Amino acid sequence: MSKPVDHVKRPMNAFMVWSRAQRRKMAQENPKMHNSEISKRLGAEWKLLTESEKRPFIDEAKRLRAMHMKEHPDYKYRPRRKPKTLLKKDKFAFPVPYGLGSVADAEHPALKAGAGLHAGAGGGLVPESLLANPEKAAAAAAAAAARVFFPQSAAAAAAAAAAAAAGSPYSLLDLGSKMAEISSSSSGLPYASSLGYPTAGAGAFHGAAAAAAAAAAAAGGHTHSHPSPGNPGYMIPCNCSAWPSPGLQPPLAYILLPGMGKPQLDPYPAAYAAAL
């Protein structure tokens, strides 16, 4: 792109006045030296000059500037526009796909509640009652998580457990046992056992579920589920008093591959069959 004909150059400063002759001399002595390297060396040499050595060039630069102002009274320095830099990439270590945030807000409003609990007091999203009572805040967070990851029935149970645990002095302990009960009931989901072998959801909370089962048995109704001996992927509701002792034999899980027969060791002990 050619420059316009009426382009007015800036007046030279003291360094430009001094380097004009020095650049020509250095280029003749080093014909293969790049212009950027010449400028770098000239700048270093200019800094080494004393004030008395720079004075003649400073005066010459002032004279040229005064002459430039007389010739071009309306001159205004307009720097060249630099090309716009590319937009910075997302600051997040794990970028969220486009449109995922809106889908999550529409399908799972509980995510907003969970985000509000973790936003802190500075954001103004957490009620003062939850800030004053951490047990209620933990119960509300657990209920919000249950609404997202569990079906409606399990979500209702989680909400009831959270409400009951909020008024108890041992709310955090009770909340853990109630969540264990919810996890055992959620094992009936279609994605819980798609390969035909038992899930590990109930076993992970074995100790906590025993206490929850005993409390629920006194009130009556369904307390927990047992895996069916005939079909390991099917959970049978049970209202027995408690789970078998963990010291007898922990529940086992087997993966049946093509070409393999039934395992010799029964993965479910006789205590499960007796409890049915």
UniProtKB/Swiss-Prot annotation:
The keyword Ribosomal protein does not apply. Residues 8-76 bind DNA. GO terms for molecular function: DNA binding; DNA-binding transcription activator activity, RNA polymerase II-specific; DNA-binding transcription factor activity; RNA polymerase II cis-regulatory region sequence-specific DNA binding. SUPFAM superfamilies: HMG-box. It is found in: Nucleus. Disulfide bonds: none annotated. The keyword DNA-binding applies. Pfam families: HMG_box, SOXp. GO terms for cellular component: nucleus. CDD domains: HMG-box_SoxB. GO terms for biological process: hair cycle; hair follicle development; positive regulation of transcription by RNA polymerase II; regulation of DNA-templated transcription; skin development; stem cell differentiation. Its main location: nucleus. Keywords: Activator, DNA-binding, Nucleus, Transcription, Transcription regulation. Disruption phenotype: Expression of ameloblastin AMBN is significantly reduced in the tooth germ of postnatal day 1 (P1) molars, but ASCL5/AmeloD expression is not altered. PANTHER family: SOX TRANSCRIPTION FACTOR, TRANSCRIPTION FACTOR SOX-21. May play a role as an activator of transcription of OPRM1. Overexpression of SOX21 can up-regulate the OPRM1 distal promoter activity in mor-expressing neuronal cells. May play a role in ameloblast differentiation. This is Transcription factor SOX-21.
